[in-house]
Amino acid sequence: SSDLTDESRRHPQYNWGYDPLNYNVPEGSYATDPFHGAVRVAEVKQMVKALHDNGLSVVMDVVYNHVYDAGAFCINQIVPGYFSRISCDGKYSNGSFCGNDTASERSMVRKYIVDSVCYWADEYHMDGFRFDIASLIDTVTINEIMAAVHQKHPNVIFYGEGWDMKTELTKPGVRLAVQTNSAMVPGFGFFSDTIRDLLRGTTFESTAPGFVAGAVVSKEALEACFMGMPSWAAQPNQCVNYASCHDNTTLFDRIALTAPDAPVESRIRMNNLAAAFYMLSQ
């Protein structure tokens, strides 16, 4: 799980793709010969085609909100500090908790991100893009990405994390792609932490039970989840309901932590109950 990755370390490690070095190069683990760029490109394309041939869509997790090492990043080497948000005291903004935040509101950074996403859609035929900490990217950039990709690929989907993270913006009046700004990015979905925490328990207390493990939760809050979270989602399709993802424990492991005395058969039923909730919600 990426939450176990210390992204402030300066030594290479397996990082689940959350330590970006070059946004337009496939990761070497997907290639039989990672030391040859042409092999990386060809074999990732072959992999995506094979998945498509078997009826599977491919959604790419993209991490444009930060880079591995802002000082060493290629664009910051060419134009120092341009790609990253830097505070008035000269320090890199760190809303991502990864050491730096991307200054997507700057025109050429925005163009780079738009061109990069279009490249993956055009060349690799990705069916969707899941944005890590989308809330550090401004709404104008998100809208330009979707508009550019949809010109050629109208069915590509877009969604991401809309958590409200604090960052040092480089311009006044910039609006970020947080949950509560969903009306500014129509067609972009946001993960709903509300239904996640109601079903499995709060993320910040690993043994706190959720509804499926017997905790008493707000009936009104559950109803709001079923109705697509109208408090922040402008449209139901902007609310991505879920109970488990790549972060933290799996749902079944979380149930084991919050209902340790329950037999396995009961834990399976709790797991199925959670699935029924998010699958039947708007």
Named regions from a protein language model:
Residues 2-124, 134, 142-153, 157:
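Substrate-binding/active-site clefts of carbohydrate-active enzymes
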Residues 66, 137, 166:
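Feature marks short, surface-exposed loop/turn motifs that line or immediately flank catalytic pockets
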Residues 146-282:
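Conserved alpha/beta catalytic core and glycan-binding cleft of carbohydrate-active enzymes
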